[in-house]
């Protein structure tokens, strides 16, 4: 089985150079990745480099902390779509979730999904900062808000995904 078409080739480093992104796109084309995930300022470059391929362009919003306003995230998402993003990875507002502001969290995801239109929206939970109960709530809120996927982590916090987190998320969203 070819697993390459399940991979999001990613470079979200603050110091990523244009040459790094060119290399990322070339690698994605070579192995047949599902997408490249880059910071928003590289969307248009990636669209140009990946034109004529099946590799999608994904970007991040509210990254990596998730603590900006809903309005900022909605603007970022709409701008990313306008620039050509096929997929958007948003970081959930962790503080709002922890403070049990569930309607805020659900509304934010819903508004960003609306800004994305028919594009894929993935919600990053940052599981290493959440309790099991918070992971379950975040998954349920994401599903209710019509997000397409939930993801475990940004890769920029304490640690990344754990098998336990993935199992819990899978049990919750199906």
Name what the model sees in each region.
Residues 38:
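Calponin-homology-like cytoskeleton-binding modules
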